[in-house]
UniProtKB/Swiss-Prot annotation:
NCBIfam families for the chain: himA (TIGR00987), PRK00285.1 (NF001401)
A GO BP entry: DNA recombination
Family: Belongs to the bacterial histone-like protein family.
Subunit structure: Heterodimer of an alpha and a beta chain.
Gene Ontology CC: one annotated term: cytosol
UniProt KW keywords: DNA recombination, DNA-binding, Transcription, Transcription regulation, Translation regulation
Organism, as annotated: Acinetobacter baylyi (strain ATCC 33305 / BD413 / ADP1)
Gene expressing this chain: ihfA
A family per Pfam: Bac_DNA_binding
InterPro entries associated with the record: Hist_DNA-bd, Histone-like_DNA-bd_CS, IHF-like_DNA-bd_dom_sf, IHF_alpha
Protein name from the UniProt record: Integration host factor subunit alpha
Keyword Magnesium carried by entry: no
GO MF terms held by the record: DNA binding; structural constituent of chromatin
Length: 97
């Protein structure tokens, strides 16, 4: 299984538009920077037809070291969650490789 990288995205964007590779790479970087900055600012990111990104706070909770069985606390932290939109789920669920 292969992975789609930012470089791959920039190459595809360059092929489909009049942007050169450098400009396409910059566009991809700006897109992800915009999402990151919105999340840092506490905003929800809603991409129609794709899905929603959200920043959530997780509370501290008890955990366990799997090797020793010792109980250890898992500290509170912020996590990014993604919920795929209905159109995206339908598209991914019906397309063949």
């Amino acid at each position: 299984m292969t992975a789609l990288t930012k470089a791959d995205m920039a190459d595809h964007l360059s092929e489909l538009t009049s942007l050169n590779r450098r400009e396409a790479k910059q566009m991809v970087e700006l897109f992800f920077d915009e999402i990151s900055q919105a999340l840092i600012a506490g905003e929800h990111v809603k991409l129609s037809g794709f899905g929603n990104f959200e920043l959530r706070d997780k509370r501290e909770r008890p955990g366990r070291n799997p090797k020793t069985g010792e109980e250890i606390p898992i500290s509170a932290r912020r996590v990014v969650t993604f919920r795929a939109g209905q159109k995206f789920r339908q598209r991914v669920g019906t397309e063949q490789e």
